[in-house]
Amino acid sequence: MGLVFNNSTIVAPQAKGIIDPNTSKLIGANDQFFQDMNAELSDKGFLVTSVDSLITWARTGSLMWMSFGLACCAVEMMQCSMPHYDNERFGYAPRASPRQSDVMVVAGTLTNKMAPALRKVYDQMPEPRYVISMGSCANGGGYYHYSYSVVRGCDRIVPVDIYVPGCPPTAEALLYGILLLQKKIRRTGSIER
């Protein structure tokens, strides 16, 4: 790997990516952002960017999440952190405190009694903050939609950025939602609320 010297011209080697073992393709092969970045890196050997783009790039690679597991969807959320899926390879690491987290994953049935606690935890998170609503119960009440004590979707309490459908959604679905959130952050930059 290293530089190649051809007639006193320094040429950077072709940029190589990480191959996804499931698809045998480069990770990000279908993503225009990664294609453009790899082309620029292999062409020039360095990247030129703005400070805003650099901060946005750093945010997508270091999302610290906080679990708000309320029911059975939390089991799938825990499975997503296990070695089989290893969501930390995408820079998605758990934190115990809302003051240290960027993302809140609401997984499960949100009751009227729990709604003020959800809002309080959301308000304690620093800006920019993002919310992933995981599962039918968090998205719209689920099986308990018509119950007097259930909030019909956590988006009535906090603004939601990504909805992950399913009852319960699989760990792959949550991982896909995380990747969509990273793409949304890259596309929009900092979200001002």
UniProtKB/Swiss-Prot annotation:
Q: Which Gene3D superfamilies match?
A: 3.40.50.12280
Q: What does this protein do?
A: NDH-1 shuttles electrons from NADH, via FMN and iron-sulfur (Fe-S) centers, to quinones in the respiratory chain. The immediate electron acceptor for the enzyme in this species is believed to be ubiquinone. Couples the redox reaction to proton translocation (for every two electrons transferred, four hydrogen ions are translocated across the cytoplasmic membrane), and thus conserves the redox energy in a proton gradient.
What is one cellular component GO term in this UniProt entry? respiratory chain complex I
InterPro entries referenced in this protein's UniProt entry, alphabetically: NADH_UbQ_OxRdtase-like_20kDa, NADH_UQ_OxRdtase_20Kd_su
The record's remark on the cofactor is: Binds 1 [4Fe-4S] cluster.
Provide the GO biological process annotations.
aerobic respiration; electron transport coupled proton transport
Where in or outside the cell is it found?
Answer: Cell inner membrane
Kindly report, in one word, the top-level EC class recorded for this enzyme.
translocase
Output this protein's name: NADH-quinone oxidoreductase subunit B
Iron-sulfur is among the record's keywords: yes
Family designation: Belongs to the complex I 20 kDa subunit family.
Q: What is its EC number?
A: 7.1.1.-
As cofactor, the record names: [4Fe-4S] cluster
Q: What SUPFAM superfamilies is this protein classified in?
A: HydA/Nqo6-like
Q: Which organism is it from?
A: Bartonella bacilliformis (strain ATCC 35685 / KC583 / Herrer 020/F12,63)
